[in-house]
């Protein structure tokens, strides 16, 4: 049991000789949210990132899963920063692993910006 209250409820069910299962079912749920890309250049969405929070990484994976047809690219302030202090993974490595093109803000490829 995960909490004292759950233990108390289980004890009550046991005392009443109620058949039950504990945490036997996993149910998916979704919290509806919106993503507003920073920039749109033609059909390319540019997401400018300084600090790349775990919640932002989860959000971007969710957006990519729901909209695989979109061309979303990262423009990192510091692409070689680690995603956290205990990781060897950099922002750039994370983007590559998940199929997002990326660049540093000071080196945006011109072919991203002009036809």
Model-derived features: positions:
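Nucleic-acid endo/exonuclease domains
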Residues: 1-115
């Amino acid at each position: 049991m995960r909490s004292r209250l759950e233990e108390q409820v289980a004890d009550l069910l046991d005392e009443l000789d109620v058949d039950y299962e504990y945490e036997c079912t996993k149910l998916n749920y979704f919290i509806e949210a919106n993503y507003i890309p920073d920039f749109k250049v033609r059909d390319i969405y540019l997401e400018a990132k300084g600090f790349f929070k775990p919640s932002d990484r989860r959000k971007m994976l969710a957006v990519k899963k729901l909209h695989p047809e979109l061309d979303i690219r990262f423009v990192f302030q510091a692409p070689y920063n680690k995603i956290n202090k205990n990781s060897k993974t950099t922002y750039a490595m994370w983007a590559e692993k998940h199929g997002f093109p990326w660049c540093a803000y000071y080196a945006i490829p011109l072919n991203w910006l002009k036809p």
